[in-house]
Curated annotation (Swiss-Prot):
Signal peptide start-end: 1-23
Disulphides: 46-59, 53-68, 131-144, 138-153, 155-166, 172-181, 177-190, 192-205, 211-221, 217-230, 232-245, 251-262, 258-271, 273-286, 292-305, 299-314, 320-332
Description of the deletion phenotype: Mice survive to adulthood, but have a tortuous aorta with loss of compliance, severe emphisema and loose skin. They exhibit a severely disorganized elastic fiber system throughout the body.
Residue span(s) of domain EGF-like: 42-82, 127-167, 168-206, 207-246, 247-287, 288-333
PANTHER family assigned to the protein according to its UniProt record, in alphabetical order: ADHESION G PROTEIN-COUPLED RECEPTOR E1, EGF-LIKE DOMAIN-CONTAINING PROTEIN
Organismal lineage: Eukaryota, Metazoa, Chordata, Craniata, Vertebrata
Family statement: Belongs to the fibulin family.
Protein name: Fibulin-5
Protein species of origin: Mus musculus
GO cellular component assignments: collagen-containing extracellular matrix; extracellular region; extracellular space
InterPro entries: cEGF (IPR026823), ECM_structural_protein (IPR050751), EGF-like_Ca-bd_dom (IPR001881), EGF-like_dom (IPR000742), EGF-type_Asp/Asn_hydroxyl_site (IPR000152), EGF_Ca-bd_CS (IPR018097), Fibulin_C (IPR055088), Growth_fac_rcpt_cys_sf (IPR009030)
Amino acid sequence: MPGLKRILTVTILALWLPHPGNAQQQCTNGFDLDRQSGQCLDIDECRTIPEACRGDMMCVNQNGGYLCIPRTNPVYRGPYSNPYSTSYSGPYPAAAPPVPASNYPTISRPLVCRFGYQMDEGNQCVDVDECATDSHQCNPTQICINTEGGYTCSCTDGYWLLEGQCLDIDECRYGYCQQLCANVPGSYSCTCNPGFTLNDDGRSCQDVNECETENPCVQTCVNTYGSFICRCDPGYELEEDGIHCSDMDECSFSEFLCQHECVNQPGSYFCSCPPGYVLLDDNRSCQDINECEHRNHTCTSLQTCYNLQGGFKCIDPISCEEPYLLIGENRCMCPAEHTSCRDQPFTILYRDMDVVSGRSVPADIFQMQATTRYPGAYYIFQIKSGNEGREFYMRQTGPISATLVMTRPIKGPRDIQLDLEMITVNTVINFRGSSVIRLRIYVSQYPF
């Protein structure tokens, strides 16, 4: 049978296909060199390789290799003639019998190299670079990588092999970047959010300390993770842009911040007092300066210095009107023997007092009392003059006393003179007389 003879011839030649290097001392894959006989003997892979064929496949040894065929495949068992065997029954040609080494001392003619190799000028089998000779079958999307005796088809970085095609790997799906990821064909790029900078590893992000690099704040910069905040010095407030600071007008917050006047200044404020006052240690309250005590007044030697809240008064000596006579430093008396004194108050006593502007009301401001109580006498207290605005009234607090009450707040500066009359009535001796306290009230300009 010519077909089987050709197969046998190829099988015999396979025993002597030269391996790269020395062809006389090595055998091709699938054969072992018998050191005693110097022959290449076939390896039965079906016995030496565990589970050479799996599943429903069975292993069939052949010269230089083995086959895996389905167990249900029909097996050919026809006649086969072998020049080295008188009888053979099997699905494949039997292995060639050992050939005596003495019959093949050397190989003196060019031989056929294994697949993936070619004979060079020195009759050596060298690797064929299929990638360089463009004799590979890699897909255009793949790259060819030459190997010893063959080649492999692979994909470049950023691609993976799927059904013979190199498809782009979406690295962004796997969290390669710490913050922002942008996929590109065959690769990816990482970026960072505002306030961060990309590290040298190209993946992680580092916070940018804006306060050190650019310091965008007008006053104080505080670095935060991924950003920064601006703070203002005391007395300033942050504007809507979050960067600039503007002066805070503390005086507009409350009218009670200072007792008198609040003066705003950049980043702060201070309280001031009007003339005649000094600022206390609390830096907000004003205290009257007693010009009379400190002799810081302009009164003459004949005048009396009377201190007021925020100022002073120079009071002239009392001058009694006719027919009154001066009987003391501040008292005038009308003589009883004088006929015009019968319908006049017996005495006029001068008194001075001061009140602050806008004092809260009602307020008891002055007390009047009889110095002597006579048997059978009673006393009547009234405001004889000066109360045209009905800002005061007399409230009798006892048989011989009464209190002057301020009923309306009075705004200063203003000077008021009231004649407070005490009428004495004695029914026992049928007597009626009166005395007057001439009260001069000085209302200051300020409510303190």
